[in-house]
């Protein structure tokens, strides 16, 4: 009963997940350290009876706090259960079946999976020799007719950081939507991040 593009898919295989307890798993963005004492203190005062009920379906209080922190309208804030859900939402929102998603190679391995689920086509361009975005990236993406272009910044696995000015130029040059995946942004100390 499933759609033909789903029936032809291979299962998604995540990266290595060492369970030895001594590895720091940066590929899953996990923190190897315990929470700060301030977090532990805040959790101790948390009303645990709230754990038995569902949160606000629209996450209004959280969205409002995020909007105020970033100086934007609450309508500009979408809260998801995790980053992968946000990526899925972007693909299903911006890319029609038969459409095109673009990225670089290498990139996050979930992009092609989400693209295939959507019944779309993935177009990738190799990074430049120094792991930066190729100079003709926007031209290649536009020629492919991409509705959504995904750029990981900082790039995984290289750690290459794309300057904000380069990303701003890319937004102006692209004919589709630019998604900047900042899953590892908290690890950047580069100025302009």
Language model segments and positions:
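N-terminal "arm"/small-domain region of PLP-dependent enzymes with the aminotransferase-like
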Residues: 1-53, 145-148
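Phosphate-binding glycine-rich loop
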Residues: 60-100, 118
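Glycine/Thr-rich phosphate-binding loops of Rossmann-like dinucleotide-binding domains
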Residues: 34-36, 87-88, 111-112, 158-159, ...
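Active-site phosphate-binding strand-loop segment of PLP-dependent enzymes
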Residues: 123, 129-190
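Short glycine-rich anion-binding loops that position phosphate/pyrophosphate groups of nucleotides
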Residues: 29-32, 83-84, 108, 153-157, ...
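Conserved PLP-anchoring active-site segment centered on the Schiff-base-forming lysine
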Residues: 93-114, 128
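Hydrophobic/aromatic ligand-binding patch that stacks against planar heteroaromatic rings
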Residues: 114-115, 170
